[in-house]
């Protein structure tokens, strides 16, 4: 992962940009993030920085997780740990601020967990057109044929069918940073991002 931060999705809104045009944005509360571990080529085989985000109660964390946070001299337990690359000269226990990473008009990508939709059919899940809607049709939202007869005598793997939809890691790329409120740790990015409100996301700088 590239240089970035952890945050949560607060919701969507409309704001006016400098040209007076209304822009649809998603509001993200990014940080405060603290460095919980610095991984090096010598010790771990690769270089990365692990950031911690989101206060948690001690009873909700394991002893190993609590010990990991305590070793990093972070005052309060954190519930989310994510590794990023591209950081230089950061110390364990230090805070990484929003203004240190992002600026206006930056191009970013946002990764989150998409909303769970439960069990859905092929029309909603895969965008199938479906059949005729009337005049005696019995084929409306059905998937249709799933294979041949004796040959090959089986259903090929990967065939699009109904099933569980959503609750998957999803990334949206090439979003623009429209506005930043460093005091409130808020980032306004153009367009929608995956996940529900209060869902955890990572925002990474592109380029």
Curated annotation (Swiss-Prot):
<keyword id="KW-0689">Ribosomal protein</keyword>
<protein>
    <recommendedName>
        <fullName>Large ribosomal subunit protein uL3</fullName>
    </recommendedName>
</protein>
<dbReference type="InterPro" id="IPR009000">
    <property type="entry name" value="Transl_B-barrel_sf"/>
</dbReference>
<dbReference type="GO" id="GO:0019843">
    <property type="term" value="F:rRNA binding"/>
</dbReference>
<dbReference type="InterPro" id="IPR000597">
    <property type="entry name" value="Ribosomal_uL3"/>
</dbReference>
<keyword id="KW-0694">RNA-binding</keyword>
<comment type="similarity">
    <text>Belongs to the universal ribosomal protein uL3 family.</text>
</comment>
<dbReference type="GO" id="GO:0006412">
    <property type="term" value="P:translation"/>
</dbReference>
<feature type="region of interest" description="Disordered">
    <location>
        <begin position="129"/>
        <end position="152"/>
    </location>
</feature>
<dbReference type="GO" id="GO:0022625">
    <property type="term" value="C:cytosolic large ribosomal subunit"/>
</dbReference>
<dbReference type="InterPro" id="IPR019927">
    <property type="entry name" value="Ribosomal_uL3_bac/org-type"/>
</dbReference>
<dbReference type="Pfam" id="PF00297">
    <property type="entry name" value="Ribosomal_L3"/>
</dbReference>
<comment type="subunit">
    <text>Part of the 50S ribosomal subunit. Forms a cluster with proteins L14 and L19.</text>
</comment>
<keyword id="KW-0699">rRNA-binding</keyword>
<keyword id="KW-0687">Ribonucleoprotein</keyword>
<comment type="function">
    <text>One of the primary rRNA binding proteins, it binds directly near the 3'-end of the 23S rRNA, where it nucleates assembly of the 50S subunit.</text>
</comment>
<dbReference type="GO" id="GO:0003735">
    <property type="term" value="F:structural constituent of ribosome"/>
</dbReference>
């Amino acid at each position: 992962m590239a240089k970035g931060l952890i945050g949560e999705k607060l919701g969507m809104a409309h704001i006016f940009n400098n040209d007076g045009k209304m822009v649809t944005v998603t509001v993200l509360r990014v940080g405060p993030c603290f460095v919980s571990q610095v991984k090096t080529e010598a010790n771990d085989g690769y270089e990365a920085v692990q950031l911690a985000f989101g206060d948690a109660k001690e009873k909700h964390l394991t002893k190993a997780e609590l010990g990991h946070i305590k070793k990093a001299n972070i005052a309060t337990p954190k519930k989310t740990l994510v590794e990023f690359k591209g950081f230089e000269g950061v110390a364990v226990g230090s805070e990484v601020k929003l203004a240190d990473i992002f600026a206006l008009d930056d191009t970013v990508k946002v990764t989150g967990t998409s909303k769970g939709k439960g069990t859905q059919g092929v029309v909603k899940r895969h965008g199938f057109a479906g059949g005729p809607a009337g005049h005696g049709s019995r084929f409306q939202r059905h998937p249709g044929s799933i294979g041949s007869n004796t040959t090959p005598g089986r259903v090929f793997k990967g065939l699009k069918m109904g099933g569980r939809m959503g609750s998957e890691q999803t990334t949206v790329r090439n979003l623009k940073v429209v506005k930043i409120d460093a005091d409130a740790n808020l980032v306004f990015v153009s367009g929608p991002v995956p996940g529900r409100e209060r869902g955890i996301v990572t925002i990474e700088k592109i380029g």
